[in-house]
Amino acid sequence: MRVTAPRTLLLLLSAALALTETWAGSHSMRYFDTAVSRPGRGEPRFITVGYVDDTQFVRFDSDAASPRMEPRAPWIEQEGPEYWDRETQTSKAQAQTDRENLRIALRYYNQSEAGSHTFQRMFGCDVGPDGRLLRGYSQSAYDGKDYIALNEDLSSWTAADTAAQITQRKWEAAREAEQLRAYLEGTCVEWLRRYLENGRETLQRADTPKTHVTHHPISDHEATLRCWALGFYPAEITLTWQRDGEDQTQDTELVETRPAGDGTFQKWAAVVVPSGEEERYTCHVQHEGLPKPLTLRWEPSSQSTIPIVGIVAGLAVLAVVVIGAVVTAVICRRKSSGGKGGSYSQAASSDSAQGSDVSLTA
């Protein structure tokens, strides 16, 4: 697998763009790579998508009529031809590497070539409000299961099974972690800063959630209170229910944050309560777009209608995202670790944001 120079882009930066401001919160850049074999139907398909925070900004699909890295956000379209040529070549090289990884994995697991198999990788970096590295990561999976991951120290690996231990020993002998760490601490951070600057109006905005509580009778004795948050960005949000001031986490049904289809997100949290005791329950909402946390109660006189159309649209978009980017099977645990971010006066136009100096095969 390649790593430096995913499933998880850098440009010539002028001195005038040196990072001096701070951002409201932490930010991330991730690339998600997926290679899927299809016996009897040609080479494995390879897809890579890049995200800054919750926004997809680039995509490459080897099955396209003319495979190229393509823009998926307005702010990335300003990049010049050299950028797109470089990212396309990096993606094509990674496609070949991951196809080889599929063949290697078949040998490691003693599997037949008759079946379809999947090799995935997610890699990238997080920066804090000051633009400095919080954490770098690189995780691989085979057939939907963890395979090998770079540890938080960016110097060692965790292998999921005996097959992955073969890869671990190979990479340790080649000192691959050192090269990957150089990418994560340098190029990755520099590109992320660049993107945050160019996409400031989109990526660094904070859309306030629209909130309300709905009431759904279950029986004569119980009802469901559902706390809604709609139209917010970024996706990070906290919804909690309390009864007489006591947290009800264990009894709360909480759905995953889902895209609304317009660049914002939706979420709800629900609790089942005894009929007649609704006033004892409060929903608490925390989000970057709120000046202070909100406290909501169900108001019987202002019963809200559930926005079914909006929710269904959100689910439809979510399905497209999941199907179109299978890559999200590899999950990143966000934990902070110290690191230094570089000045982006050093962002070299010859470096790919995805990394291109190292080719890592399992």
Curated annotation (Swiss-Prot):
Q: Which stretches does the entry tag as region Alpha-1? A: 25-114
Would the keyword Signal be found if you checked this record's keyword annotation?
yes
Molecular function (GO) terms listed?
peptide antigen binding; signaling receptor binding
Q: Which SMART domains match?
A: IGc1
Record's subcellular location: Membrane
Q: How does it sit in the membrane?
A: Single-pass type I membrane protein
Gene3D superfamilies per the UniProt record, alphabetical: Immunoglobulins (2.60.40.10), MHC class I-like antigen recognition-like (3.30.500.10)
Tell me the disulfide pairings in this chain: 125-188, 227-283
Ig-like C1-type domain spans which residues?
A: 209-295
Q: Which InterPro entries match?
A: Ig-like_dom (IPR007110), Ig-like_dom_sf (IPR036179), Ig-like_fold (IPR013783), Ig/MHC_CS (IPR003006), Ig_C1-set (IPR003597), MHC_class-I_related (IPR050208), MHC_I-like_Ag-recog (IPR011161), MHC_I-like_Ag-recog_sf (IPR037055)
Extracellular compartment ranges equal: 25-308
Which stretches are transmembrane? 309-332
The record's region (Alpha-3) falls at: 207-298
Q: Which residues are glycosylated?
A: 110
Describe its assembly.
Heterodimer of an alpha chain and a beta chain (beta-2-microglobulin).
Q: Give the family, as the similarity comment puts it.
A: Belongs to the MHC class I family.
Q: What is this protein called?
A: Class I histocompatibility antigen, Gogo-B*0102 alpha chain
